[in-house]
Amino acid sequence: MPALSPRRPLLYALALPTLLASAVAQAQDGPAARTLDKVTVVAERASTATKTDTALTETPQAISVVTQQLFTDRGAHNLQEVLRYSAGVTADAWGLDTRNDATSVRGLDPVQYQDGLRRSYGFSPLARPEIYGLERVEVLRGPSSVLYGAGATGGIINAMSKRPTFGALTGEVGVQFGSFDRRQLQGDIGGALNDAGTLAGRFVGLVRESNMQTDVLNDDRIYLAPSIGWRGERSTLTLLASYQHDRTGSSQQFLPLAATLLALPGRRLDTSTFIGHPGFDRIDSRVYSLTALFDHSFNDVLSLRSAVRYIDGRTTLQQMYVDSYSNPADPFIDADHRVVNRTAYGTRPDVQIFSADNALQFDFATGAFQHLLLAGVDYSQYKEQLQRLDATGTPIDIYAPVSAAPVVRGWDRQPDQTSTQLGVYVQDQIRWADRVSLVLGARRDHARSKTEGQPSQTDNATTYRAGLIGDLGAGVSPYLSYSESFLPVTGQDLFGQAFKPMRGRQSEAGIKWQPARNLLLTMAAYRITETNRQTNDPDNVLNVVQTGQIRSKGLELEGQFQFANNLTITAAVARNEAEVSRSNFALEVGQRLNDTPQDLASAWVSKGFQLDDAARLRLGLGVRHVGNTASLGNGGRIITPSYTLADALVEVQVTDWTMALNITNLTDKRYYAPCRTFGDCFAGYPRVVTGTISYRF
């Protein structure tokens, strides 16, 4: 498919208001517009922080909720883009990256969950989740092992799937067109399936054909997600199924530092440059998923909640990229500084994930104290069968790329890997006088990892959490919290000693202010310490020791406002100071954590205007700022500049029709996110224009 000219989407954007005005004029004599769904900006409750349906103002930990309407308004196309306006989240941590949704939270890596069950393990080979199938995304910042077991210190990103509703049959169908010849057909339909209202179904799906920023590569997807729900007098059961097939390639070409950020005048590569080999570079990923969610209330005191999921994912990832790592400052192999060597890489993981979480919930009182006690057991098993490609790359002139095919010898089977985790947890949410909430929790985990042909490794860990939040009046609720995490580290040192799990500890203090339902302001200060990080042994170059430590501290401010005159505002500001606090190499100690911005800020404003009885106009504008990043290594220290981007929305609703135009990176600013002393640069997003026409019924 030929790519659209960069100018053509902008011309379409300039022409769209005229087309929309014409549509409004034609609709003025038509039927009155249906009552429009309210744009929900200020979420009131979330389940990720406590695994119970708890008000945000009763949750003593920072959590952000991004609703489907909000991330659609902002023009998000993937999970990374959903989080661009969330406090403390570096959403595009590695720029435009089709391999996975890499983000950082408070300078550290989070773990990705879906519907409360873990979805990602390390560098996940699974296709990225389709956000058209989500109703919201919750971000819990900081360690969270008490409820979720082994996980990273950064926190949890929990994507919540669309589920069946028991009302009248409703839905939408739509088409999208946009930059890079994007063409997408999408639909969402659901409602009650019987007269009694005890059975409901929903179907969400889309088909997309598209190119992408990187030349040559496609970004095609098929997504199908049927679901069915049943509700009885005391029980509910929801079955969620999904199938996803992605045909794409690695958008990141690992462009050489010497030809991007540090390039000589006239020698900087365009961020769209493709340095791979057509027909070889590809990502082909299929994911099948089945989830069962069951709730049963025995009586007013005791209830059961159960969640089970099975995922089967198969991916082939192949890429030829520049070998900048052998000589980061000068990767060229010719006198004219044009030709570089390339590395041929291929991986073919076949993954099966089984997860189950079962909990009993007790709702009772002891004197003046109301308890919401949760006691649960969860289990997860991750299996991976892996093949790696045996191939040799070929040189290429990066300024006039004409590729020679790699030399491929075949696929080599790797040892199978299996990881299991069994955890038992208990949590008590104690409420006093309907004003003060105390949260106490503890957990014991047994984690086991096994690599075929090697001894298995077992880790046991106990983690704790505590939090206190109180309503002082006028909607002001200060809080304090402490939480822990652990993450098993597979392998052994040179002397046969198994590595210890990495440990994380966070102390947090903050204030939540909600004087009315349409306004929520959260301020949080935190300090995180992560220990047992692996570093090279200064006494033995062949050994690795766990003496590394990272300390992350910062301040966050986040607000959501929704006014009666169709005006909505969200804003976030964050300052993070993540640094290496302990290392075997004195050069690192006290230095900023690589590739981590210290400053983040964003704001989004949208306003609705009633044009007449049959039509409404909505305009939105957002600004995002990401501070500079540092990279320290053997090649010295480099700074990747900060960048500020703008996004825009123009939407017209005419009776049952909605026509929306989204533009992200409005000024088409070219930037990197980030560049590293290892020798490569990660390109940022270009301007992307997307037009969506949808019909609701």
Regions found by a protein language model. Name each.
Residues 132-135, 146-226, 230-236, 288, ...:
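Outer-membrane beta-barrel translocator/receptor signature
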Residues 295-299, 303-309, 313-321, 478, ...:
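Membrane-embedded beta-barrel scaffold of Gram-negative outer-membrane proteins
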Residues 231, 351, 370-374, 378-382, ...:
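Structural signature of Gram-negative outer-membrane beta-barrels, strongest in the C-terminal barrel
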Residues 109, 247-261, 383-386, 468-508, ...:
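Surface-exposed extracellular loop regions of Gram-negative outer-membrane beta-barrel proteins
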